[in-house]
C-alpha cells in the first residue's frame, strides 16, 4: 500500500534524499542556504526509510545543484542521494562523494599557514588524499584535515 507523501513532489529543482536522520539543518548550513534566498524549500525530518531506518529529506524548488556544490555535504550526510527534478520527473540521480579539491570555502586549521596570514591574497585550497574516510591536505602548509575539521 502506498503511503501518503508528507511533502508534495516538486516540479523543478533538487531533492536531497537519504540524509541521516536529524542532519537536514546541517546540510542546509553546509550548502550555505539560509532561507533568505527566497527559494521554496521543504524539510522532512525523521521519516521512515527502508535503507536507513530513519532519514531526512531536503527539497529545494527552482535550483539545480551541481555535484561540485553538493559533494561538500558528504561530510555531514555521506549517504545522501541527489535527485535533479524537471517537470516532476527525476532526470538525474547521483550519490554524494568527497570533492577532489575544495577552494576558498574553509580556513586551514594551522594558524601559521600562509592562508591565515593577514593581507595575504591566498585562497585556501585543500586536496583529497584519501577517500575512506575522507582526508584532505592543505595545498600551502601540508596540514591534514578531515572534512569535519574544515566544516
Ligand atoms: N521527488 C520529488 N518530486 C518529484 C520527484 C521526486 O520530491 N517530482 C522526491 C521523492 O519524493 C523522493 C526523491 O525525490 O524523495 C527520489 O524520487 P524517486 O527517484 O522517484 O524515488 P525512489 O525510487 O524511492 O528513490 P531511491 O531509489 O533513490 O530511494
Curated annotation (Swiss-Prot):
- UniProt xrefs under HAMAP family: Asp_carb_tr_reg
Cofactor: binding details: Binds 1 zinc ion per subunit.
- Molecular-function GO terms, alphabetical: metal ion binding
Known Pfam families for this protein?
PyrI, PyrI_C
Subunit architecture: Contains catalytic and regulatory chains.
Keywords associated with the record = Metal-binding, Pyrimidine biosynthesis, Zinc
Q: What is this protein called?
A: Aspartate carbamoyltransferase regulatory chain
Q: What does this protein do?
A: Involved in allosteric regulation of aspartate carbamoyltransferase.
Report the NCBIfam families cross-referenced here: ATCase_reg
Q: Which Gene3D superfamilies match?
A: Aspartate carbamoyltransferase regulatory subunit, C-terminal domain, Aspartate carbamoyltransferase regulatory subunit, N-terminal domain
Cofactor(s) required, per the database record: Zn(2+)
- GO biological-process terms attached to the record: 'de novo' pyrimidine nucleobase biosynthetic process; pyrimidine nucleotide biosynthetic process
> Which top-level group of life is the source organism from?
Archaea
Family, per entry:
Belongs to the PyrI family.
Which InterPro entries does the UniProt entry name for this protein? Answer: Asp_carbamoyltransf_reg_N, Asp_carbamoylTrfase_reg, Asp_carbamoyltrfase_reg_C, Asp_carbatrfase_reg_C_sf, Asp_carbatrfase_reg_N_sf
Q: Give GO cellular component annotations, separated by semicolons.
A: aspartate carbamoyltransferase complex
Coiled-coil positions are: none
Q: Which residues bind Zn(2+)?
A: 108, 113, 138, 141
Q: Please report the organism this UniProt entry assigns to the protein.
A: Pyrobaculum calidifontis (strain DSM 21063 / JCM 11548 / VA1)
